[in-house]
Amino acid sequence: MKKKTHTITFNSAIYMIKTIFTMLFPLITIPYVTRIIGVDGYGKVNFISSIMGYFVLLASLGISTYGIREGVRVKNDKKKFDSLVSELFTINIISTIVSYSFFVLFIFISDKMQGYLMIAFVLSIKILLQPLSLEWIYNVFEDYIFITVRTIIVQIVSLIVLFVIVRNRQDICQYAIYLVVSSAGINVFNYIYSKKYCTIKIKCNKNMIY
């Protein structure tokens, strides 16, 4: 399954464009959000989001690193690559279920989280969407054009969503929704576009990767 590859210079230039957009984005969103919902509201959502990051990390289970390493070896054999992706996708679903279970348990046993339940459950959608990430596939095939274009599109759409739904000081939960839209957009794009490189199926057998 040979795909067109680009030079290191080209890939570096594309990646630099993505990096510039990623750096500029917070310069627009953070001042707007802190002005509308206040520093306290911004801090609350980002505090919960930082906690959620640990559960997302648990759900990812180091699959991206393993996928890149093994994917590079078999990327020219579609059958083997499909098998690798399907097995890792299945493992990721299982790890996501486990991680989300820990999240629910944590939410209800932590006194500090009781005042943030709505925000926490909105942001927890990030955990559930983790299996759709599949970012490692595009790193295997060095498809930095897709990664860059996808990132820019999602950031622009997310910015529009932010301006539409976050309009006053009470829109703290709406800000959490905006964060989910940013994350979900990338993951959904990744899953849909992955069909260019592989066929993903739920695959369970005794010879799973780990």
Enumerate the language-model features and the residues they cover:
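Signature of the first transmembrane helix
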Residues: 6-64, 159, 183
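Helix-loop junctions and terminal segments of transmembrane helices
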Residues: 60-76
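Interhelical loop/hinge segments that connect adjacent transmembrane helices in multipass membrane
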Residues: 1-4, 8, 145-148, 172-174, ...
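Membrane-interface helix-loop junctions in multi-pass transport and translocation proteins
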Residues: 34-42, 108-117, 142-187
